Amino acid sequence: MCGIVGFTGSAQASPILLDGLSKLEYRGYDSAGIAVRDGEKQAEIVKSKGKLSELKKKTNDGEAVKGSCGIGHTRWATHGEPSTLNAHPHTSDDENVIAVHNGIIENYQELREKLTKSNYTFISQTDTEVAVKLIDYYYKKYNLGPVDAIARAMIRIRGSYALCVMFKDYPGEIYTARKESPMIIGIANGETYVASDVPAILKYTRNVYYIGNNEIAKLEKGKVTFYNIDREEITKELTEIKWDAEAAEKGGYEHFMLKEIHEQPKVVRDTINSVIKDGKINFSEIGLTDDEMSKISQIYIVACGSAYHVGMAVQYVIEDFTSIPVRVELASEFRYRKMTLVKDSLVIIISQSGETADSLAALREAKEKGIMTLGIVNVVGSSIAREADRVFYTLAGPEISVATTKAYSTQLVAGYLLALQFAVARGEMTEEKCGELLKELYTIPDKIEKILEDKERIQWYANKLAGAKDAFFIGRGIDYAIGLEGSLKMKEISYIHSEAYAAGELKHGPISLIEEGVPVIGVLTQQELYEKTVSNMVEVKSRGASLMGLTTYSNYSMEDLADFTVYIPQTDSHFAGSLSVIPLQLLGYYVSVAKGYDVDKPRNLAKSVTVE
């Protein structure tokens, strides 16, 4: 992995490839490369280690590499160290077949040994070079065409992959194939684009095809032909991407993350409005009926990372509003557990990209067991969106920063809306009560805007926190779930060691980590748990901790305890997480800025984890 872009048309390919790759930088990478063909000439390949700027220098921003057909790649090392040699594209021995690849080929060592016996030589440590030479093997040995050669290779390869391949004998054409790893194809004005994610081509077209699992596509100027793995031609419908191209730009902000934090009021409002008709929740577009909801006996929420933290918060809300027991599971663990899923269950899969490998595998596991699945995703046409029985689309738009903010917030409100409608459908909440809570939910975007007005105070505290070696977050109930997200933000972009604990668990071990000056951030928005969490904060303060209190207006006694206090507007306690998470996002952001780090592209991380 991590980013793929391809183009064939009349324009010069290199600038388009470099521009597309720059839109995928948020996915994380350690090297980059392009291969471009000028008519029937041999492809010119340029690769570099490090930032994309190095590749741009080598190619004079693409002007030095001529041709109207090409493929490009940003690599995040999985097999082989980060280096120019291991960077993509990779080629056959005679350079007549060239390819880039996302994913992991699990049996690459076995295939490499067999190809070596057939006199192929390998110069890199990558599994991608194995894929290229396997395609070349079938292409030459059996005198096959590109589609047949790729299909034969796909049958032999085990693992996940998205491939873009060029053949010297087929100028102006790009061949793509995928299994489990995302790939989209765009078309506009007689030109054709391919990419691993929407932002790479959004500037050029909003009309895209989604290439399915175990499918192959042939790209020509303004034309795409699709095949299944049996080499039979298949038809597909174009999908229009609704995202605004400007949403994938910084728009005057220093970082995408800060821009996306400020976009949260709008995207939360849009997501709420997407399922409200005549003042009531309407899930007709999701396809989830009241009758189905009334029969659900158990809910499993399955996700990874921040989406898992969403699930933890939503669990409390659903269980408060309904009598349905809810279990929240890490997708990477769920799929391997020998658990019996309760009949009439619902498995909710939460994923911004809709391509998260472990979440997708968990969805398939649930479907195999005959359990209804619901995807909460942000990308229309993504794998989870296509395969889930029901889909709730969040309207966050393109999220570029690796650290999620606005997608998290839209997932959270999607969870609230599900909880409310489950309660009404099951007769556990009146329409009147639901209407009152909806009215309060509609105030959340305005209250987020009010919190953002206080960001300078949070920046001041972040500057003091930047020198910390450790940081701890504590809370109870929903506040604990929000603390987990705040802790993740801190560690993933500021590289400060950070952990979150249920406040009641401090005395069972974690309190031994508290020493003089260590920052402890307490989240206290659940009024019935306020005094208990305060007592835990008193415990850590007595052992030398420096306290930040995050609570609602009216809890002014926090001033007497904490060294720094952030207040959020009052709201229904079930929805408080949508407000309390905002200062924690800002805190993580400003600590990272104070330390001089690349906020949008933290080390060792990728935006969309499409391998296991």
Language-model features, listed with the residues they occupy:
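Conserved short alpha-helical segments that host acidic/polar catalytic motifs at enzyme active sites
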Residues: 1-250, 254, 266-297, 336, ...
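Glycine-rich phosphate-binding loops that contact phosphosugars or nucleotide phosphates
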Residues: 294-436, 440-443, 523-568, 587, ...
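Active-site phosphate/pyrophosphate-binding segments
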Residues: 264-268, 272-300, 390-519, 592-612
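Generic C-terminus detector
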Residues: 231, 546, 559-561, 571-612
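Structural beta-sheet core signal
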Residues: 4, 99, 165, 176, ...
